């Protein structure tokens, strides 16, 4: 064997293109290769042997060449198979294996020749005579465009693997004495395959990979941390070199190499099947995941080929040795026709030897497996078998494989990857008593050919079927329960009868609540819902008929299969041969299925097994005890329920026709037995009222069941209560306004209007006026009346003086009340009252004030507020209103006088009651109105100058602008609000008083009005009041001082008393300035 040294190793790269077809196969070619190398290198010495041609650059860097005879038979030169030829022809470019250097390791005891991806700056080439099949790399790279997963080892070239590929080396390790140091194989060039792949394969982790050995040395940095799970016990993960073999359906995945595959957010994890043939497909085609870093550039796994019989042997050398860690980090990637863009970084295994029966392990070599956050760790089985992915399930690890099979809730599913299903007789048994990280893997297997290898795939359909069976179990239980709780016809009848009886009881309780008199007859006046009571009675009637139908159905069911009457003799006995089953009609009898006769009234017999449920022999009652069929038992239960609820007396032998026979007869005749007798109605809608009917009195005097009688009996009682209240002077709470007929003539009620007051009075003042009018001057007792009573008389709904002697008529059908018309009438009345009060009360109050205190006047008097009325004008307006309502002029005058006297008396009484010392400081307001030619003068509220200036402005414009008001306020030292109130009061007085013009004229002529006293004893007052009113006022004139008459001069108090007349007017309160009150009264306009 000759040695050739090459001082120019870089020049050897020029030799590579000269190799025919990219291969070094024959010795002739090796000779030509040596010549070419010598020509290029110049100083290189070429030595040619039978099988090797090696170039070295110096004597110190020599590599021993192994003779061809030392190789295994299947590694020698052989032709490619048809599949490889087809792949080669399809690509058109021969595949050149990756740069691989062979180094002789003297320290390894097994003596195997190691192939490592070691490349230093020195480049060496070793040519072998074996040709490699390009189809092997086609399976890896052609059409796949996938990246190698991480943690898949720095692959030393597996020259002893099953594929025979001619290795063309660009770089050769010159170290003779063993494996290169760490980090010596980090930057390799990529060997181009037939076409470029998108991802470059970066492999790191396994520094040494020796095939064919029986020992596998492992260290913590070499093994994969597998089986980690966040929750639940870890999954059993089996790792091995079998997962690196291409050709199966499943691939080894790692969390740092592959994206998390098979993840499911909920439920149990999906089984991820990775085949060796799709090893690279699972990386790039399906996962499309980014390969993490921490991986050195890989030497190509040239040993990942199809495991055939001729390819299952390994290349061993006596002097081979495992390299140290990280020895394969700087290797150049050979380009195999396609160049990957992304790199797959694979780390994890530092040392791995396949093929031995024993696997040497140490704590630093074992996988950190089975870690769990809680609970005991899962037993993780790691071994070489998982590197051969024969099964559809893949070995998974937390650091190398994507976390597959994760479950968001619940404990994890047990994933068992059996060694036999992984394609070999591998026994992975964890040692007991040791930590989960120290697991022993017993492997007694050898690589088998593909022809002998049959993948045993788990049946997914079985798993799905098991899951479906688990889900169907509750359904079966529900069906069984339904069958057990199956209800027959008799049970339905019993249940329905119980429901009907319950509803009847409910409706009866409802009727009893309104039919009783209650304690001391208090329930007689209870409001009774007539329609609801009718509905309840109709409901009870219908339920009884349904109960009758249920008994009819029950008897019909019991009559099926009955024995004919002719079969019984005179004593009621029947021959046993004539007995047949009522259900099946058969007469066949066996010892275990005899016919049993019912002891009820149905005269039927049943087979033991025809009954539902079947009647067993041990449950048959003795002869002295009777046995009833299900139909007779149901009827007995129904009769018992009916008798207890409705207090009936029905027997078992009775027919269904006896059940509620009266109700059935009434229904047949179209009548309802449950009428409304004894239940008075509160229904106010008397649509059957006929005002022209001849027998109204007969209806009223009818029996107690009449609804109208009860209604009007209660109405008469209410009237009596009202009369009692009136006799005690208490106001009535009756406010029924819905019966007022505004178009009706109320001339007969004028007398009542004149004899009553609109306000409640507690004193006897001025009541003789009305008595004198009624009895022609005779003094009568005090008369107390209530405004409600008067209002009822005005509305035409009450004649209390008639008492019980007056005939009672049914209620009228009242039409809708015209409230607008009613409001107009009341408003006109109120205007008349205010006019009279404004003219006469000022005279009476001011006169009494003068008698008590002399001619003193108060600063609180307001000249601005002048309430006077023209009697002629108001009388004429009232006459017109009265004529519209059909009143006569005489009655109008009488009514007007009575109203005047009544209101005068009311105001005097009000002042007497509310008189206090606080009112003594006040004086009567100056009305400034001439009554019967008299004058009165007083100081104005704002002063004479201010009043005169305001009157001038009022004469110019009654509705001044705001700017004018502000100027007046600034001129007179008043507020804008005071000026506005003065104009408002003045406008109202101007509309309702005829003397405003004369006052304005007086102020224009600078004439100060003077106050004149009124002689109460003279004819001046009589000219205002008529004789009847005057006589009463003169009678009570002496008591005004003692009653505090002078204290009521405040206009606001007058307004409070007038407010009792109703909702027809409201007060307009002026502001208070320096404890001086100015009050104006304005009638409210029609709100409608």
UniProtKB/Swiss-Prot annotation:
Any one biological process term the GO annotation gives: regulation of DNA-templated transcription
One GO MF term attached to the UniProt entry: DNA binding
Cited Pfam families: AT_hook (PF02178), Homeodomain (PF00046), PHD (PF00628)
Coiled-coil segments on the chain, per record: none
Keywords on record: DNA-binding, Homeobox, Metal-binding, Nucleus, Plant defense, Repeat, Transcription, Transcription regulation, Zinc, Zinc-finger
Biased composition (Polar residues): 272-282, 303-320
SUPFAM superfamilies: FYVE/PHD zinc finger, Homeodomain-like
Record's compositionally biased regions (Basic and acidic residues): 788-802, 874-901
Signal peptide positions (record): none
Keyword Thylakoid appears in the UniProt entry: no
Protein's cellular compartments: Nucleus
Region called 2 X 16 AA Asp/Glu-rich (acidic) repeats, residue ranges: 678-744
Spans of repeat Sequence: 140-152, 173-199, 205-239, 240-274, 283-295, 316-342, 348-382, 383-417, 678-693, 729-744
Domain of life: Eukaryota
Gene3D superfamilies assigned: Homeodomain-like, Zinc/RING finger domain, C3HC4 (zinc finger)
PANTHER family registered for this protein in UniProt: HOMEOBOX PROTEIN HAT3.1, POLYCOMB-LIKE TRANSCRIPTION FACTOR
Family in the record: Belongs to the PHD-associated homeobox family.
Function according to Swiss-Prot or TrEMBL: Specifically binds to the fungal elicitor-responsive DNA element, 5'-CTAATTGTTTA-3', of the gene PR2 promoter.
Protein name: Pathogenesis-related homeodomain protein
Origin species: Petroselinum crispum
